[in-house]
Amino acid sequence: MGTAPAYSLDGGRSLHRWLRDMREHHPVHRELLTRVWTLYRYRDITQATADPAVFSSELWRYLPGDRGDDALTAGNLTAMDPPRHRLVRDLVSRSFTARAVGALRPRIAAIAAELIGAVADRGEMDVVADLSDPLPVLVIGELLGLPMADRELLSDWARRLLSFDKGDLTDEVVRKRVADTQQELLDYLRVHCRRRRTNPQDDLISRLIRAEVDGQRLTEDEVVNFANLLLLAGHVTTTLLLANIVLTLDEHPAVAAEARADRGLIPGLIEETLRYRPVIVSNMRVTTRAVTVGTEQLPAGQLVSLSFISGNRDEQYFTDPDRFDIHRDARKHLGFGHGIHYCLGAPLARLELGIALDAMFDRFSRIEVTGVPVDYYDTPGVAGPRSLRIAFRHH
């Protein structure tokens, strides 16, 4: 069995071989060193996400010595269980509507065109640094109503929070730096939230402050932490997923040519990449009581890792799962999670990705990855390139 090979080793190739073996022989497995249980099969993962009463996202409630800081967890939908999760999600959904997201289309297109235009004469670019990193920060910053002058600051915070590696988590200095960076961002968002409370505008933060369901509103901590979640999760997902798409198309030139010729295939291309090369690798839960999964008995108070990257390649659920097929119905993938914690920002990410791909296909007649070997993040829970150099030709 051994230890899981790092994704960063070879872009997940060795890891996927290892995961296939785990699904077959050890689908529910407890790691001796970390004592964390991992679920590797699609069915077990989705049954866990569908049962938040047993598989809780409020890790701090059930783990001895874990600090439940309301100021940090309030409004963080990913760390919340029903019934509060339902209320907060309803309140957020009133403001973060499909209409609000759709209204961003012209701005996303303009931002993507501007970013691509800035590098078009070079004949080469870093997909991450030049396009997929700044795009979501600019879009989400605009959605939240944050000052244009602060965009580089926001991007820097997001990059710093993504850039620590797995091994760094044991380093107290690194952990403090991560915590300090997170606090800086929260403090910044709190100042902006208080400004909007006294001077509301037509932006998401103002709408979150005003949102009401059954006479209940979001607290200040909840507004601040949701803005933080949207900024960080929205940034990471779109940044790495666009890079993952470009990388995957480079490996499958016939698919790239097909999608370029028929732009109606782009939505299917995005969904299949979310399955084939997801950004969010796993998610944690904690058991609230003893539960049987497969043939294993998990006691109460156990940390459980849901291996989305493994579930997305489960042979029992997806036909020929190691084949990249943009014509398959991949919508049941776990790339945006599953159950009550399915990504609220998924429509925005899909819109950004579709527009960015369209813009790249329109501007460039040929795109080729040149930065080999690719430098991957080794950050826990996410998978994607730290940078991705490409060369291109104009139409």
From Swiss-Prot:
EC number: 1.14.-.-
Record InterPro entries: Cyt_P450 (IPR001128), Cyt_P450_B (IPR002397), Cyt_P450_CS (IPR017972), Cyt_P450_sf (IPR036396)
Enzyme class, spelled out: oxidoreductase
SUPFAM superfamilies: Cytochrome P450
UniProt entry tagged with the keyword Oxidoreductase: yes
The entry's keywords: Heme, Iron, Metal-binding, Monooxygenase, Oxidoreductase
GO MF annotations in UniProt: heme binding; iron ion binding; monooxygenase activity; oxidoreductase activity, acting on paired donors, with incorporation or reduction of molecular oxygen
Cited Pfam families: p450
Highest taxon, organism lineage: Bacteria
UniProt record similarity statement: Belongs to the cytochrome P450 family.
Protein name as annotated: Cyclomarin C epoxidase CymV
Native organism: Salinispora arenicola (strain CNS-205)
Gene from which the chain derives: cymV
